[in-house]
Curated annotation (Swiss-Prot):
GO MF annotations in UniProt: metal ion binding; ubiquinol-cytochrome-c reductase activity
Transmembrane segments: 34-54, 78-99, 114-134, 179-199, 227-247, 289-309, 321-341, 348-368
Protein name in UniProt: Cytochrome b
Subcellular location, principal: mitochondrion
Gene Ontology terms: biological process: mitochondrial electron transport, ubiquinol to cytochrome c
Domain of life, source organism: Eukaryota
Binding site for a ubiquinone: H202
Known role: Component of the ubiquinol-cytochrome c reductase complex (complex III or cytochrome b-c1 complex) that is part of the mitochondrial respiratory chain. The b-c1 complex mediates electron transfer from ubiquinol to cytochrome c. Contributes to the generation of a proton gradient across the mitochondrial membrane that is then used for ATP synthesis.
Gene: MT-CYB
GO CC term (a single one): mitochondrial inner membrane
Length: 379
């Protein structure tokens, strides 16, 4: 009897063990769909991005016009651009839901998978930031100026570092060219790291809603989860197309319809919605260096999650105290997102400061304490 080529061929074997015969817990819910959705987002963004790059000119005198040219003159250019711009928003929605799932179900205890995942988040944020600068609209230019300028808060080397990143004494042509380079390069780095993320995940196998070992109850990924993921994929694409075709500018900033002008500052400089929570944390600290450190820590705190786990149980599924804290954290992040989009005036300043303190308190202090209290309640 001849063996199945799928299981013997060196390349097909890898694909088979990752996507076809992969033993998966039988009880994983729809919250486990987001990994495959993120993979799809990455492929979609890369394809649309490559097609956009074919028609884009990374020069300050041409960038804005070339984007207008894409939307007006290129066959389906408007669709490619709208899908790329809104695809980024969808990417971040899926990322945040994926991370939220990881925190709720204690997936961060797979340390290698969690750390590569957090690094992937940082790389994706960097990619989105440099990509936002490329259309060279008002918000692109001023966003780049404000965010890169934060590095000047670094003692001693700050100013030199900022000028080195700019390639001059202000955000100019050199900045746009290198940002385009980074925006093209980083997604491929993300792809490499994604493979590492999957490699580490397949070393341990998937977690499941109970947080218990599921080795005694595994089912093959295909057809069970391939079809289940396909449903999620169809829903996601339906949502993306609805956004791109009916409300293409819903999540964008109107200031970006104005070409970049270094002599005129927009009334409210703010990033895209997916960075607003971090931007609110940055603004809530009156000191420049302190703000930059808080901004960094708002993401880097994820690396500390495995070390801060005090509970005997893995998931939050059966821990009411931690559940309350988890949902308070989600509500708090929504408040921070809202504050990030508001002007710097009362009462928004104080709300932002309180929400920032609460964000770090929940993650660093309250959740570990709740875990210990719940352990005591069990004994």
């Amino acid at each position: 009897m001849s063996t199945n080529l799928r299981k013997t061929h060196p390349l097909a074997k890898i694909i088979n063990n990752s996507f076809i015969d992969l033993p998966s817990p039988s009880n994983i819910s729809a919250w486990w769909n987001f990994g495959s959705l993120l993979g799809t987002c990455l492929i979609l963004q890369t394809i649309t991005g490559i097609f956009l790059a074919m028609h884009y000119s990374p020069d300050i005198s041409l960038a804005f016009s070339s984007v207008a040219h894409i939307t007006r003159d290129v066959q389906y250019g408007w669709l490619i651009r709208n899908m790329h711009a809104n695809g980024a928003s969808l990417f971040f929605m899926c990322i945040y839901l994926h991370i939220g799932r990881g925190i709720y179900y204690g997936s961060y205890l797979y340390k290698e998978t969690w750390n590569t995942g957090t690094t992937l988040l940082l790389l994706t944020m960097a990619t989105a930031f440099v990509g936002y600068v490329l259309p060279w609209g008002q918000m692109s230019f001023w966003g780049a100026t404000v965010i890169t300028n934060l590095l000047s808060a670094i003692p001693y080397v700050g100013n030199t570092l900022v000028q080195w990143i700019w390639g001059g004494f202000s955000v100019d042509n050199a900045t746009l060219t290198r940002f385009f380079t980074f925006h093209f390069l980083l997604p491929f780095t993300i792809m490499g790291l994604t493979m590492m993320h999957l490699l580490f995940l397949h070393e341990t196998g998937s977690n499941n809603p109970t947080g218990l070992n599921s080795n005694t109850d595994k089912i093959p990924f295909h057809p069970y989860f391939s079809y289940k993921d396909l449903l999620g994929l169809i829903l996601m694409l339906a949502f993306l197309l609805t956004l791109a075709l009916f409300f293409p500018n819903l999540l964008g900033d109107p200031d970006n319809f104005t070409p970049a002008n270094p002599l005129s500052t927009p009334p409210h400089i703010k990033p895209e919605w997916y960075f607003l929570f971090a931007y609110a944390i940055l603004r809530s600290i009156p000191n420049k260096l302190g703000g930059v450190l808080a901004l960094l820590m708002s993401i880097l705190v994820l690396f500390l999650m495995p070390a801060l786990h005090t509970s005997k149980q893995r998931t939050t599924q059966f821990r009411p105290l931690t559940q309350i804290l988890f949902w308070s954290l989600i509500a708090n992040l929504l408040v921070l997102t809202w504050i990030g989009g508001q002007p710097v005036e009362n009462p928004f300043i104080i709300i932002g400061q309180m929400a920032s303190i609460l964000y770090f308190s929940i993650l660093l202090i309250l959740m570990p304490i709740a875990g210990m209290i719940e352990n005591k309640m069990l004994t």
